[in-house]
């Protein structure tokens, strides 16, 4: 916030900010955006793009909190899986800030129910996640409709070649702000690896969970099937666990996430994609039951614990064949 806010209050100041989740970035871009809004002019002035519905709602909620003493400022979350008609109605009534997932925003653009010609500021939050989820073409189409004369801010946990390419394409003389070192995981996280035979993996997981009775954490699996199987086994064995993956309906996912947020649920077994929109500050543990494919994904997972000055533990349960991959990570 110290780095970003003063810079963003200026004009024509593009920013690439490399920051882990949990570093206060919503306020870093949100406060200057709110400051720049002309409330009397009820047209879209700022656009925030983010990868998931959950993050979209969370950012919109934060912006509403920050601006609650500014009479008449309107923030509209635009996301799939909800009524498009109510979003179209809100756009007709006039909004100042649009927080959107790329897919639903494109849909509205194609229906000619939203115009981006008055946008002065664009934020791409968790840009690396949006690219990982295959939104590159959507982002290109959206930014082609936004005026060239704009401020563009790109927030990403890691500096991948794709992020470098997209910032070169859309940002002008961007200031690069790095909170912590590039691509590093947060220093408040202790990393632990347990090597076991493949057949003993679930037994090892139970031992770990038993060793930390106060655990409040996420267990990451690689597939939806494995996620459901592990969650079912843990529940059968009496643990306070549940699953989160793409085969659940939106209503089921919302229920599970809400239970987890308010700590009615101790252990969430999840896929990477399903957990993307979940933002919880005080997780004690992240357990990699299935190793991710690359260091970036591992950094994202482990960055969910050890936030906001607290300490956390990232545990990987690997089999003998995965030792080389773990060493690379």
Describe the function of each predicted region.
Residues 1-329:
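Conserved helicase RecA-like core
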